[in-house]
Each structure stands twice: as structure tokens, then as C-alpha cells.
């Protein structure tokens, strides 16, 4: 049998079955030498763990007048490529020889969620503990350096899984569209580029409502990858108000109690109004919140962690994606039948319309 020298092998891949019948993929690449286990959730579709409020809010968004035209304009202006170029020139691209530990955590998460193609990962200099995922044809993830300084390895992996969840669920195209629309609204007082009268306040509210609900789906991806609700909780807690110096003085049980207290506030209808106003600000895109409050997210993910749906996914019973891996969300009208009266989409649409009418009334009065 001929002998092969590894240093002479380029892009050479083999598949072997061990005695224990566990399948490993050996990727002997001159640039990346590692043993890669098969994905934890092989072929999983983002729809398998997508939160129903995410689906409903997207349905509402797509039904708001002006969405289709905005989508066509977004594609025309190609928002995706400039952002990728920016980070290629202004951030550090993570790889086997650049932030090797972070890359290992990233590869594990990519494997577990069976994301293909592998997104590009960047670290950018920013002390705020934040991250985001963008791109459809060439997806990428950006971690602020503050994430690396605040979190431990398990928690960094949780953040990476969260962003991969956005990619897996097909959120990134809508996120980019929202960012582009908001930048147009913020930069141009008199709409140009054929967008005059297009980006209504109702459409803006619908974008932000969907954006917040999309986070709930990605939190589920975090739990699937970490398989540890405590890691998810500690990550949320640290991003909410973590500290290196006083890390020993924070308590997860107290954070959970705070989450429960926050939910109790809804018993007073006036508190619900205040929450709505806090999320939506004055109606300006710069004052609206893109994420749910961490204690609210904590409630939803703890609820799912004890669900039968989560248990079945862990057992391997879940919806599979196509050959491409991640599920893309195309820019088109939904094919699902219209919801029944008083469904969640109807409620959101009614709130958006009422709020837009009030904003218009105040503008006329002013």
C-alpha cells in the first residue's frame, strides 16, 4: 500500500468509519488541519426552531404597504457588499491562525447547526459587548472586541451560535433591508432615490417589531448549540450589565427572579403601554429598540428549554433543510393563507396602523 506524506496533500478529504461507527470527516488541507465531527443537528432547517412570534411578525411586515417596492429598491442598491468590504478592510478576519481559539468555537457552532457555506467571521474594535450577522450570498458575522473581553469561552460560543441562528433562519436579508431603510430615513429628510412616500412609519414599526421577535428564534439556536440553559442565562446577564471586577457578586437566580418580576408588571395595563412606548420610542428609528429586553428573552428561552419541541429536536426529530443548508427568506409575498381574526399578525398590524395614525395626527397638529 503506498504511503502518503501529509505535507504533499492539498485539498485532500477522506471519510472513514471508526470501530464505534461514529463518522468523522478528516479534512487534510494545507491551511486547515483538523478533525471535524459530523454536525450535532445534521441538516436542520431554521424552521425547526424558529419562534412562532418571529414567523407572525414577518408575515405582518411583508403585508405592510410599500414592503415589496422597498425590497426591490434594496436589491437595486446592493447594501450587502459595501458592508463586507468595510469589515474586510477595517476589522480582523478570524481564522486558524488569527484568533485561533475563537475560530475553534466558531467552527464547533457552524458544525452543530450544520450551516453551509461557512460564514466569514470578523472581530472589530468596539468596547460595547455586541455582535451581528449580515449577508445572504456571502454571510458574515461581526463580534465586537467587548464580547471577547467580557465573556468566557462557553458564552462566546453562545453568542456565535446566536448569530448563526440568524443566518440559519434567513433573517439576514431582512435585517440588512431594515438597516438600509433606516439609514435612508436618518440621512435624507426629503426622500429621494424613488423612495418618496415609500418608507412609512408603519413600515418602520413593522420592521422593528419583526426584528425583536427574530431574536427569540436565534436564542433558541444558542440553546441548541450550548445545550445548557445556565450558559444562555449567564451570557444574557453579562451582556445586560456584566462586570469583570464584580463578576463574583452577580447571581443567576436573582436575574431569573428579575425576569419573573418584569412579566408580573403586565398585570397592570398601563405598564403594558409604557413597555410599548419604551420599545418604540418617539417613532424615530434612532429611538426604537431592535432587541427585546434581556429579561423578556430570558422568559421565552426558559419556557422553550422545558418544552417538548426542544426535547424532540435534541432527539433528532426536526425539520430538515434543503441541500444548501440554511433556509433563505426570499423577497416575496407569503404563500400562507391569511390569519384568522384577532391573530397575532392582526394584532400587530392594528397596533402599527393605530400608532401611525397617531403620529400623523401629531404631525398635523404641530
Predicted regions and their residues:
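Short, basic, low-complexity termini and linkers enriched in Ser/Thr/Gly/Pro
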Residues: 1-30
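An active-site-proximal "capping" alpha-helix that borders the catalytic cofactor pocket
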Residues: 106-109, 211-232
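Substrate-binding clefts and substrate-entry loops adjacent to catalytic sites
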Residues: 192-209
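Active-site His/Glu-centered metal-binding helix of metallohydrolases
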Residues: 151, 160-169, 217, 221
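Short pre-active-site segment immediately N-terminal to the catalytic Zn-binding motif
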Residues: 143-158
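Catalytic Zn2+-binding segment of zinc metalloproteases
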Residues: 164-183
